[in-house]
């Protein structure tokens, strides 16, 4: 229970309507004779300003004073306290007792945590760095082996992932000039692209190799078989399909081989005849000029 001491004469005016008809009550007392200040009295004052009670007086230490509750009675009296007594007020509420929005508190904690979060330096001898360097070198070698340029790779990735990929991006990755975070992201993309490019290259090489094997495949015809084919050509230079099949069975050759031989033989015969005709025409022309 706290007390408010009055060191000077204080004037108390009752709040009833008859206050103007009575003289103000003067109270003189020392610091030892102080009035108790309670929250209950303050609350009563703020809620019952419309009530009017008489002002009973009592004596304390042979000095007249006025109290809110008279001894032996429950009659309440409301006063107008001096201004200097109201200026003291109550102590401020302690900050931790104030309620705070949990959402705002969580946001502040998260913001504080992120502001204190500092990226740890990367160890250049770590396994991740060595693995990244190894992949960059392997990627460059395999890219060149497949026949792709840095521009080809950048355009292929830009068509799928966006315009942030270019020849400069691939060049910086192969030279390890990107940040570790960006290089790790690009490594996954380039690894997938390289796998797909090698699959396409394998299919292309297989197809080209098969075509080359077909073109380079040659059949050796024996001298006896050539003589027999020459005799048949002298008899019939354009044999039918049945005759070609019969000759192939007799000479132990494939039907396609016999057919191609007759085609080539007719072309050679045509070139020989053309050459002979040109030679005869030239000789005749020279003979006429000499005359």
From Swiss-Prot:
GO CC field: nucleus
SUPFAM superfamilies according to UniProt: Homeodomain-like, lambda repressor-like DNA-binding domains
SMART domains: HOX (SM00389), POU (SM00352)
InterPro entries, per the entry: HD, Homeobox_CS, Homeodomain-like_sf, Lambda_DNA-bd_dom_sf, POU, POU_dom, POU_domain_TF
GO-annotated biological processes: positive regulation of transcription by RNA polymerase II; regulation of transcription by RNA polymerase II
Motif 9aaTAD: chain residues: 5-13
Annotated keywords: Activator, DNA-binding, Homeobox, Nucleus, Transcription, Transcription regulation
Domain POU-specific: 124-198
Entry annotated with the keyword Transcription regulation: yes
Family matches, as Gene3D superfamilies: Homeodomain-like, lambda repressor-like DNA-binding domains
Superkingdom of the source species: Eukaryota
A GO MF term: RNA polymerase II cis-regulatory region sequence-specific DNA binding
Keyword Transcription tagged: yes
Places the protein is found: Nucleus
Function: Transcription factor involved in the specification of the lactotrope, somatotrope, and thyrotrope phenotypes in the developing anterior pituitary. Activates growth hormone and prolactin genes. Specifically binds to the consensus sequence 5'-TAAAT-3'.
Family: Belongs to the POU transcription factor family. Class-1 subfamily.
Note on domains (UniProt): The 9aaTAD motif is a transactivation domain present in a large number of yeast and animal transcription factors.
Protein name as annotated: Pituitary-specific positive transcription factor 1
Organism of this sequence: Macaca mulatta
Record lineage: Eukaryota, Metazoa, Chordata, Craniata, Vertebrata
């Amino acid at each position: 229970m706290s007390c408010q001491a009055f060191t000077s004469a204080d004037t108390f005016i009752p709040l009833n309507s008859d206050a103007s008809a009575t003289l103000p009550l003067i109270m003189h007392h020392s610091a030892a004779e102080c009035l108790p200040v309670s929250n209950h009295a303050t609350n009563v004052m703020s809620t019952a300003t419309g009530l009017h009670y008489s002002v009973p007086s009592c004596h304390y230490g042979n000095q007249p004073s006025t109290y809110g509750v008279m001894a032996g009675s429950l009659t309440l009296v409301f006063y107008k306290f001096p201004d200097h007594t109201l200026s003291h007020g109550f102590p401020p509420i302690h900050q931790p007792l104030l309620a705070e929005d949990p959402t705002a508190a969580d946001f502040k904690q998260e913001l504080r945590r992120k502001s204190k979060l500092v990226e740890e330096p990367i160890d250049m001898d770590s396994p991740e760095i060595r693995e990244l360097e190894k992949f960059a070198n392997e990627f460059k070698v395999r890219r060149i082996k497949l026949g792709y340029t840095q521009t080809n790779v950048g355009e292929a990735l830009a068509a799928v992932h966006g315009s942030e990929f270019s020849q400069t991006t691939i060049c910086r990755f192969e030279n390890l000039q990107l940040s570790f975070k960006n290089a790790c992201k690009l490594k996954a993309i380039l690894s997938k692209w390289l796998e797909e490019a090698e699959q396409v290259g394998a299919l292309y090489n297989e197809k080209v190799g098969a075509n080359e094997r077909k073109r380079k495949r040659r059949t050796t015809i024996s001298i006896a078989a050539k003589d027999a084919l020459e005799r048949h050509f002298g008899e019939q230079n354009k044999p039918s399909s049945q005759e070609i099949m019969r000759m192939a069975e007799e000479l132990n050759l494939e039907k396609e081989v016999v057919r191609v031989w007759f085609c080539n033989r007719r072309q050679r015969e045509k070139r020989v005849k053309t050459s002979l005709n040109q030679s005869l025409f030239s000789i005749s022309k020279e003979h006429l000029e000499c005359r």
